[in-house]
């Protein structure tokens, strides 16, 4: 197999059918594993209609957790490229979606896929937009300048099988995506960011859902930092340019919201942010500043 795709679901998903339809029309050698913990009665009946060629459903009557589900299904797979997708995302209608990922993975160990949020008029929508914008900026900077990054956004990313096995898969931690990316980073993995392919992330419509998600992120990041800060500090002292983009990945809301409130133009904000970070890191970089600005408009 060229690529193995993994979609963990808790309860149910109203987007997985569209994802499976898209993948069925992709002209690559593929296999898809959908692990469902505690499926609802409605979704259990729907699963029968979703089964197709090279699509395997793993049904768990109890909640085993995302890390366990992914590790188990990876063990059943054979693809050299492992693509991990959350069940609450939307994919573009691109007949070469998987082919582009496979091509990009020929030159990297971990691929962070571009996340897009449609900026609506609500405050939550705007806040989520700036959060994911910062994720994309961080990944692009890390990919373009260092080809390394200690974090990844787990809603959509790919990893080579040999690197997955090298770090012994996911661990049962709150932030399993950042954790596996950090362990791969410490194993000197290559990191890349793709603008060719993207996913669209869901923006929660009420404060309770938003708060629950952000609380989980905050706890996960705190526990991650407590476990890894010593080892990462040794690397960051040698290469501080890896650390600065990571700050915006881990704490996007505060940084982005504050600066966007002070500087009304997002284009101007991007310009000042990149110029400030890299002019402090390396005196040879400012000549690339204007080239940076042009690139950032592609976010």
Regions inferred by a protein language model and the residue ranges of each:
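A conserved acidic beta->alpha catalytic loop
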Residues: 35-45, 62, 89
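Long helical/loop segments within the catalytic core of UDP-sugar-dependent glycosyltransferases
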Residues: 68-69, 100-166, 171
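Short aromatic/hydrophobic "clamp" motif used to bind/position activated sugar donors
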Residues: 82
């Amino acid at each position: 197999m060229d690529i193995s795709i993994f979609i963990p679901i808790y309860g149910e998903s109203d987007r997985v059918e569209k994802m499976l339809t898209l993948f069925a029309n992709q002209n690559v050698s593929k296999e898809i594993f959908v692990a469902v913990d505690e499926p609802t009665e409605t979704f259990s009946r729907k699963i029968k209609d979703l089964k197709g060629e090279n699509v395997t459903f793993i049904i768990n009557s109890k909640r085993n957790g995302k890390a366990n589900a992914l590790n188990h299904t990876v063990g059943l797979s054979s693809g050299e490229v492992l693509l991990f997708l959350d069940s609450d995302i939307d994919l573009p209608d691109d007949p070469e979606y998987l082919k582009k990922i496979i091509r990009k993975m020929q030159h990297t160990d971990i691929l962070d896929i571009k996340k897009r949020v449609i900026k609506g008029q609500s405050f939550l929508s705007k806040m989520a937009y700036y959060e994911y914008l910062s994720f994309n900026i961080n990944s692009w900077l890390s990919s373009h300048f260092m080809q390394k990054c200690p974090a990844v956004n787990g809603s959509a990313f790919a990893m080579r099988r040999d690197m997955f096995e090298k770090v012994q898969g996911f661990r049962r931690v709150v932030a399993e995506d950042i954790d596996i990316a950090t362990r791969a980073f410490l194993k000197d993995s290559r990191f890349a960011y793709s603008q060719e392919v993207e996913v669209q992330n869901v923006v929660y419509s009420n404060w309770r859902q938003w708060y629950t998600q952000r609380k989980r992120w905050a706890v996960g990041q705190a526990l991650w930092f407590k476990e890894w800060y010593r080892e990462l500090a040794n690397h960051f002292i040698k290469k501080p340019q890896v650390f600065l983009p990571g700050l915006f990945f881990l704490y996007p809301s505060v940084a982005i919201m504050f600066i966007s409130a002070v500087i009304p133009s997002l284009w101007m904000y991007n310009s000042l942010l990149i110029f400030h970070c890299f002019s402090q890191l390396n005196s040879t970089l400012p000549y690339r500043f204007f080239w940076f600005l042009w690139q950032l408009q592609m976010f």
